[in-house]
A protein has these predicted regions:
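Residue-level signal for mature regions of secreted extracellular proteins and peptides
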Residues: 136, 177, 213, 226-227, ...
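Fungal secretory targeting signals
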Residues: 1-36, 273-295
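Cys/His-clustered metal-coordination modules, chiefly Zn-binding fingers
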Residues: 220, 224, 229, 237, ...
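Structured recognition/catalytic domains enriched at protein termini
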Residues: 29-218
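C-terminal low-complexity/intrinsically disordered tail segments in eukaryotic proteins
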Residues: 205, 212, 216, 220-221, ...
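Secreted/processed peptides and extracellular or luminal domains of membrane proteins
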Residues: 149, 190, 226-227, 239, ...
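C-terminal GPI-anchoring signal of eukaryotic secretory precursors
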Residues: 232-236, 240-284
Length: 295
């Protein structure tokens, strides 16, 4: 299985980036315009973890080269729903974040694309023992010949929830063992069956709005009403991908990088030293330090 690990992107190259992403995506669009795009929350799962100041929240796009047709967006909320003693927590607004840069991600030439908030942009602090819920909403664009005849395209959305427990004597975060050889009971992703693609007229806008298409290219997806069954267990994070993710978490949100909310970045060459890039073991150590500081 191929994973997406592009090179870091600087702010100075953002315009070039948009052109290259558009060009590469357009070539891919010509060759393949139908299939099932699946989006899964692969970490955390419905399991128990030690308290940590930062718990990675990682999504996987399967058949990801088709994702640009959907102009994808993900919104994430995290709630403490039960205290460790079984009582109900005092109400507080959810910790939230949007992966708004997904619509410009380079999904091309990859079977699987990982998307996640990087450390400095992650608002989630799973430091309190108890039962938590991570609720995520996948939002995607669709169009039909009839809708485009009326100069509109439509957004659909689907919401999923994962329940996890935070407890002091539980396992530390390990992305490799935490996603390999595991059952996915209670996990459910979103699968969208693209049957065709259509050209978007320049006059088209979102239904009920005046805003125009902001995604890559000028092609949108036509989908079926039947919903394919998702299979989150198909995706795991191997050591190489975990190392890349650890570096992205550590360095991917700095001012030198264009994408601050979605990232599958490989560490820059000058960050790959022992001092600059965490190994897989170092990733566990990073979260372990956060956990230790919370005890």
């Amino acid at each position: 299985m191929a994973y997406h690990v592009p090179v870091p992107i600087t702010l100075g190259t953002s315009l070039t980036l948009h052109f290259l992403v558009f060009s590469a995506t357009w070539v891919k669009m010509v060759g393949a315009s139908s299939g099932v795009v699946e989006v899964d929350l692969i970490f955390p799962r419905n399991e128990t973890y030690a308290p940590t100041a930062y718990l990675p929240i990682i999504f996987a796009f399967q058949n990801s080269h088709l994702a640009p047709f959907l102009d994808p967006l993900i919104h994430i909320d995290a709630y403490l729903v039960q205290n460790a003693n079984g009582s109900t927590p005092q109400w507080a607004p959810p910790e939230s974040i949007d992966l708004e840069q997904l619509r410009w991600a380079n999904f091309t030439n990859n079977d699987t694309y990982f998307a996640y908030p990087t450390y400095q942009r992650n608002e989630f602090t799973f430091a309190t023992e108890g039962i938590w819920q991570v609720t995520w909403t996948f939002n995607w664009a669709v169009c039909t010949e009839d809708s485009l005849a009326n100069n509109i395209f439509i957004r659909n959305e689907s919401q999923r929830t994962t329940t996890l427990t935070i407890r002091k004597d539980a396992q530390e975060v390990d992305l490799v063992s935490g996603t390999m050889g595991k059952s996915c009971s209670g996990q459910d992703g979103v699968a969208v069956n693209i049957t065709n693609t259509l050209h978007i007229p320049s006059s088209a806008h979102w239904e009920g709005q005046t805003d125009k298409w902001e995604g890559q290219g000028d092609i949108c997806a036509s989908t079926t009403s039947s919903v394919p069954k998702s299979d989150p267990c198909r995706v795991s994070i191997d050591p190489a991908a975990a190392a890349s993710i650890s570096c992205s978490i550590t360095f991917g949100s700095s001012a030198a990088n264009f994408s601050t909310t979605t990232s599958s970045l490989t560490c820059p060459e000058d960050k790959k030293s022992a001092a600059g890039c965490l190994t897989v073991g170092g990733l566990a150590a990073l979260f372990g330090v956060f956990s230790y500081l919370l005890h």
